[in-house]
Amino acid sequence: MVNLPFAGHTNPTLGLARVLTDMGHRVTYIHSPAWREAVENTGAHFVPYDDYPLFPRPFQDRMRCWRAAYRTVLRIGAGYDCLLYEMLFVSGKALADRLGIVPIRIFSTFALNEHVLEDFGRNGGLYLTSIFRFPRLRALISAPMSRRYGWRFRELEAEIVRNSPALNITYTPRSFQVYAGEFPQSRYAFVGASIDGCRHEPCELPEGGGPLVYISLGTELNKSERFFRRCVEAFGGTGVRVVMAIGNSV
């Protein structure tokens, strides 16, 4: 297994690593050094990225991790049966093909195709979706990455959509998947949410019997105090129980 150092893309995969090791499989998980404890708690063998700092600066976490993860898999991956990679590691399919092993892609949220990415680029926030909104920007970014990582296609969207592995595991129920009918059951397993339990800290839900709503902005764009205040105002006095993940910056 290989992943990039982002909590929202990593946490859903830890339960899978645990299940595979419990079944007797030898699982090696390549990740940032900061994720050693979380990975080793699953029973998997942890391998840190080659030539990567223990405490990287934010820019390194976002950029250098791609090359470090790729080089580490390339160095040790040939002896394995398959490569499980989270979808953000776009080079996973091309890398598995280069190593001659089976690729398996994991979607930590919903599955992607050209229609999903088109909607994503049109409706999502500019910071994360501009690459899918502006073709020239996408081409400018895609070309050097395609050459460096041996993509089948020169363009990012084509590599994601058209160079798809035979098995894709999606942590979203099919009933929640947008354009669900465009994802064949023979290639996409919609397994639902992966929640590995509260193993490290006590986890107590709000008291009461009302509906439970979980609110999160993820790990990247989560510094909106205004958003969380509006959620409190919206649900206040409704009888709804609310759990908010606000990180350490609000």
Predicted regions located by residue number:
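Donor-nucleotide binding loops and adjacent catalytic segments primarily
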Residues: 175-250
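Glycosyltransferase specificity loop/lid
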Residues: 1-135, 142, 226-230, 235-250
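Ser/Thr-centric signal marking residues that sit
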Residues: 3, 28, 172, 216-219
